[in-house]
């Protein structure tokens, strides 16, 4: 919800163009992505898309693929999740100026408190990396088999806290390159200080856009 408010008040996005879904079911996720596709299509390449997800992710233990876990999904059954590969395909095909994705989730099977969510073996799983396509860049809260930790005293995940902090400090007028550097540095430091374990956010741009994404801004 906090990111939604920042989109409207800090980035200046029109309220009608911002959708917020809490406790999203699998059908909710699919419906909202369809809405985004429809809206972007009518702007005929003039719009920019921002997708933010905070929640659980789970791994497929057989092929190491990653899934978002909706509220009606089961941590032990990936067929009840939404494949990250499908998300990237849907967003990467948008006919937009840019697509920026923020995922405050990990896909190792671990919960924010360090317990295991899905893995029958009780060990974190390193999922395979999905490569973004189109005009898309993806910011993820953690890499490989890491856990995306909470920042309990701040009421957010570590990743989301520093994302919002930088947007607030700059009033949204910051390049994605500088935003990514800031988030990665601060989350790595704070995760070690607070949890004693490294959480290292990653930034994955589509190969077709080169380094051009580093000059993109969310508010312009």
Task: Name every feature range the model reports, one short phrase each.
Residues 1-220:
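Cysteine endopeptidase catalytic domains of the caspase/legumain-like
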């Amino acid at each position: 919800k906090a990111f939604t408010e920042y989109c409207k008040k800090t980035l200046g996005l029109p309220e009608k163009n911002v959708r917020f879904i809490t406790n999203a079911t699998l059908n909710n996720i699919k419906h909202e992505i369809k809405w985004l596709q429809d809206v972007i299509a009518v702007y005929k390449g003039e719009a920019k898309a921002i997708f933010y997800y905070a929640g659980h992710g789970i791994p497929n233990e057989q092929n190491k693929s990653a899934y978002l876990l909706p509220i009606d999904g089961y941590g032990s059954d990936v067929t009840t999740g939404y494949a990250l590969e499908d998300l990237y395909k849907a967003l990467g095909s948008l006919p937009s100026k840019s697509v920026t994705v923020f995922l405050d989730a990990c896909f190792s099977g671990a919960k924010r408190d360090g317990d295991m969510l899905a893995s029958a073996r009780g060990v974190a799983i390193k999922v395979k990396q999905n490569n973004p396509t189109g005009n898309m860049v993806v910011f993820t809260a953690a890499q490989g088999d890491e856990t995306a930790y909470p920042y309990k005293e701040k009421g957010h995940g570590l990743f989301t806290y520093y994302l919002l902090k930088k947007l607030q400090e700059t009033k949204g007028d910051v390049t994605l390159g500088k935003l990514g550097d800031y988030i990665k540095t601060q989350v790595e430091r704070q995760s070690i200080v607070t949890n004693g374990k490294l959480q290292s956010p990653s930034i994955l741009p589509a190969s077709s856009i080169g380094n051009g994404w580093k000059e993109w801004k969310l508010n312009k």
